[in-house]
Amino acid sequence: MDLSRPRWSLWRRVFLMASLLACGICQASGQIFITQTLGIKGYRTVVALDKVPEDVQEYSWYWGANDSAGNMIISHKPPSAQQPGPMYTGRERVNREGSLLIRPTALNDTGNYTVRVVAGNETQRATGWLEVLELGSNLGISVNASSLVENMDSVAADCLTNVTNITWYVNDVPTSSSDRMTISPDGKTLVILRVSRYDRTIQCMIESFPEIFQRSERISLTVAYGPDYVLLRSNPDDFNGIVTAEIGSQVEMECICYSFLDLKYHWIHNGSLLNFSDAKMNLSSLAWEQMGRYRCTVENPVTQLIMYMDVRIQAPHEDLTCCPQRFLHLRIHGDVPHHADSAGWRLHLWSPDPCSDQPLLNQDKSGSMSVHPRPEDKTRRASR
């Protein structure tokens, strides 16, 4: 980055006026002269050369006020040949216009520089003073909070400087006041209202010298959000929220959601909270007592948002109107073996599948219900 002339302080203005007067004398006489007199530590400096004649055969730059061989920094023979000298540090080169480029510039680069230009049968010399300045301390920035909740929290950032020409960057993009962002009249404070998950970084920048910019550190924001949705994926796949699986088979379920930060998972089976907190559940060998409805609940403790999704596991051909009734209370008709216990009369239902197609009850024309006898009961009655 090319550096321009200094400003503000009295001694810099005096120095600038002296340089301009010297340049005017050089211009009047048609001689080459050095125009660049200011550099910034750590940046690129161009010790600019002006009034250069045509058909230059060689540019030679020297450290100090004379062009002795021991002081040579670098020489350049157009179009491309460059020869380093004893004072070469590896940071210097000569551009097409014959100016000396130094990058990065150091404080000890301050001093006189002499250039010798050979063009045809003529050799011209010029000497100029380069002053290298150091920028102030690093630009400071502070925020009132860095851990936030989307659409709920706001953040205020302060640029710690006395300069009022401040540029604010959000996600490395220059920003200005808007419906969601406000910059104070002095430019030193940026407020982001209702932060978004896409607000990732904040930074401020000032122009310390013309075309010389200082940036603060980049502040990272942690914005919690979600869950936006929750899905319950299963293997075997579910159909309309129902997973069909055989007894003894494997069933896998996974709770999927889009959220940030760490989530908490809860599983509920037939209304009972399970002691299980992972996103994935694996039923390696499905049992009857594992049939029924499962609910995966996802909780973001930071945003305090909760979402859930249900799925039902059932056996093939299971009748949804039958399965919830695991016990039947019946009026007893007919001579069917039974016994009484503390709960009253209880039938020995011989079907191993409570939702089997085999009828357990018979209904006569009057509406009375009787138990369908087992085959062994029929044999026993026939032998009497």
From Swiss-Prot:
Domain Ig-like C2-type: start-end pairs: 227-314
UniProt keyword annotations, A-Z: Disulfide bond, Glycoprotein, Immunoglobulin domain, Signal
SMART domains assigned to the protein according to its UniProt record, in alphabetical order: IG (SM00409), IGc2 (SM00408)
Entry-listed glycosylation sites: 108, 112, 121, 162, 270
Signal peptide, first to last residue: 1-30
Superkingdom, natural source: Eukaryota
Compositional bias ranges of the Basic and acidic residues kind: 373-384
Keyword Signal (UniProt): yes
Biased amino acid composition, Polar residues: 359-369
Disulphide connectivity of cysteines: 255-296
Family stated for the protein in its record: Belongs to the immunoglobulin superfamily. CEA family.
PANTHER family: CARCINOEMBRYONIC ANTIGEN-RELATED CELL ADHESION MOLECULE 18, CARCINOEMBRYONIC ANTIGEN-RELATED CELL ADHESION MOLECULE 8
Protein name per Swiss-Prot or TrEMBL: Cell adhesion molecule CEACAM18
Name of the gene this protein is made from: CEACAM18
